[in-house]
């Protein structure tokens, strides 16, 4: 046991919390000590919610967004514009775009971007399922709303090459989103304007 910790159980709990993104050991310690001060019922409810999430959450069979059912609420909503599909990197980006209240179409979650340095290729992403969605018909515009990074631009170009002859309009967000920024960290007003003022994608990286 590390002499810094009075209990091996405490040390183990801190170690597990510190594995979470953005959580260092000091923050992990505060979280663990906070839980220790709570009633047993509160801690059990917290643990149960995490376990239930892991075992029962589903991914939408259409867009790959997180859902409680086979088809997510957005895809199942007849009031959404099914002729538009906004392609995003991850589920957090869906939430970011929804928060702008400037988009009423559907989504397609890739699950990442092409990144050879990280060992992520096109086959690791939900690109082929996007191609199949477009091929099924009914989609007039695909909005490429990926992060303005080299990896995001590379992914945009790859998708462009896959869809360019399929008769759909391909557009990208207006450059209100700064180069190098990830979508989820862009403020709602800027992101909303970038969606409204989106431009046709010309196939350049």
From Swiss-Prot:
GO MF annotations, alphabetized: DNA binding; zinc ion binding
Zn finger limits (C4-type): 60-75
Residues in Toprim domain copies: 83-178
GO biological process, one term: DNA repair
Swiss-Prot/TrEMBL keywords: DNA damage, DNA recombination, DNA repair, Metal-binding, Zinc, Zinc-finger
Entry keyword annotation includes Magnesium: no
UniProt KW Zinc keyword: yes
SUPFAM superfamilies for the chain: Recombination protein RecR
UniProt xrefs under SMART domains: TOPRIM
Pfam family, one: RecR_HhH
Matching InterPro entries: DNA_Rcmb_RecR, Rcmb_RecR, Rcmb_RecR_Znf, TOPRIM_dom, TOPRIM_RecR
Stated role: May play a role in DNA repair. It seems to be involved in an RecBC-independent recombinational process of DNA repair. It may act with RecF and RecO.
Similarity comment: family membership: Belongs to the RecR family.
Protein's name according to its UniProt entry: Recombination protein RecR
Organism whose genome encodes this protein: Bacteroides fragilis (strain ATCC 25285 / DSM 2151 / CCUG 4856 / JCM 11019 / LMG 10263 / NCTC 9343 / Onslow / VPI 2553 / EN-2)
């Amino acid at each position: 046991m590390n002499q810094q910790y009075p209990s091996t159980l405490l040390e183990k709990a801190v170690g597990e919390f510190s594995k979470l993104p953005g959580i260092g050991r000091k923050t992990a310690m505060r979280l663990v000590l906070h839980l220790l001060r709570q009633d047993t019922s509160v801690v059990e409810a917290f643990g149960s919610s995490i376990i239930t999430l892991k075992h029962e959450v589903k991914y939408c069979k259409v867009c790959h967004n997180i859902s409680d059912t086979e088809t997510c609420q957005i895809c199942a909503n007849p009031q959404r514009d099914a002729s538009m599909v906004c392609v995003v990197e991850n589920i957090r980006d869906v939430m970011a775009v929804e928060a702008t209240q400037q988009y009423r179409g559907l989504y397609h979650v890739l699950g990442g971007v092409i990144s050879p340095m990280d060992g992520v290729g096109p086959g690791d992403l939900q690109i082929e399922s996007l191609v199949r969605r477009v091929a099924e018909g009914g989609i007039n515009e695909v909005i490429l709303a990926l992060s303005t990074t080299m990896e995001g631009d590379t992914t945009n170009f790859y998708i462009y090459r896959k869809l360019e002859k399929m008769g759909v309009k391909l557009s990208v967000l207006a450059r209100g989103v700064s180069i190098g920024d990830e979508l989820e960290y862009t403020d709602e007003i800027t992101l909303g304007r970038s969606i409204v003022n989106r431009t046709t994608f010309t196939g350049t990286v």
